[in-house]
Amino acid sequence: MAPSRNGMILKPHFHKDWQRRVATWFNQPARKIRRRKARQAKARRIAPRPVAGPIRPIVRCPTVRYHKKVRAGRGFSLEELKLAGINKRFARTIGISVDPRRRNKSTESLQANVQRLKEYRSKLILFPRKPSAPKKGDSSPEELKMATQLSGPVMPIRNVFKREKARVISEEEKNFKAFASLRMARANARLFGIRAKRAKEAAEQDVEKKK
């Protein structure tokens, strides 16, 4: 194969009938057409539902390196659905993805996703199962006429960054050790239980000594 990018130039020692083992890519254009046709067929099949599939929750990326960014998660947690007033079984039938394994670790993420669900529910045009006998919660005939298939992602997630104005750095900020503070905070969180246990044992020993 041809050298790629700025890597080391190899000195390949070709043996074992190497010409039979050359990887080819002649089916790429046809595969591209096939994928496109499959997408179009799926869009026609699921119409008037959104092409991109069900709505996904807003989640933060894991690890310190990426947790400044938000992205789409797998599914909404059961707690989020409960606060939004949506049944978990009914949610799947109206284009809401559900992940019963997910746990909410912060109030901010919980509130953001509950608000997302409520907004989605208010915008949703719900077709009746039987057009002759619509049920409570189904959209009106006027709204059904307005319904169009959404081609992009449902309620796309955007990373919004606030720009801070330039200002003079204070002396306290200059002396602040960010890395050491983070390490200390992590250590305190990790050792919280052990320290509490030791403090409890020490207090019990003091009580015994006083006796």
From Swiss-Prot:
Q: Does the keyword DNA-binding apply?
A: no
Could you tell me which InterPro entries the record lists for this protein?
Ribosomal_eL13, Ribosomal_eL13_CS
Molecular function (GO) terms listed?
A: RNA binding; structural constituent of ribosome
Cell compartment(s), UniProt: Cytoplasm
Q: Which domain of life is it from?
A: Eukaryota
- Which Pfam families does the UniProt record give? Ribosomal_L13e
Signal peptide stretch = none
Please provide one cellular component term from the Gene Ontology annotations of this protein.
endoplasmic reticulum
Q: Where are the transmembrane segments?
A: none
Q: State what this protein does.
A: Component of the ribosome, a large ribonucleoprotein complex responsible for the synthesis of proteins in the cell. The small ribosomal subunit (SSU) binds messenger RNAs (mRNAs) and translates the encoded message by selecting cognate aminoacyl-transfer RNA (tRNA) molecules. The large subunit (LSU) contains the ribosomal catalytic site termed the peptidyl transferase center (PTC), which catalyzes the formation of peptide bonds, thereby polymerizing the amino acids delivered by tRNAs into a polypeptide chain.
Name assigned to this protein = Large ribosomal subunit protein eL13
